[in-house]
Amino acid sequence: MPRYLSLVRVQENTIDMADADPGFEARMGALFEEITKAGVMLDTAGLRPTAESSRLTWSDGKVSVTDGPFTETKEVVGGYALLQCKDRAEAMEWSRRFLAVHPPHWTVGLEVREVEEMPGA
């Protein structure tokens, strides 16, 4: 069965958990319980702020390191979910439901990509 990586994209400086409505955590918990019981969720997590991260770049035969925050970047990956679904349509539906539990005044995006399986893996 194919796996899909759902990358949560946020504008890091505009999301404040203290600004979430009172039912947000309960809605998210209920969705995570449902998706886990359905056997779809393989792994998920939020990510620490970009101020605590580093970027490594390979160029001209060398690795360069840039420490965050990355102020030039508007959107950042704020979390991920690894889903195992029967098809892309199912992955998209779970992803749509994930977005719908967020407070309406937040802007959150998802990029859903199928994981390319290596032959023999």
Could you describe each region identified by the protein language model?
Residues 1-121:
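Conserved, structured core segments of small domains
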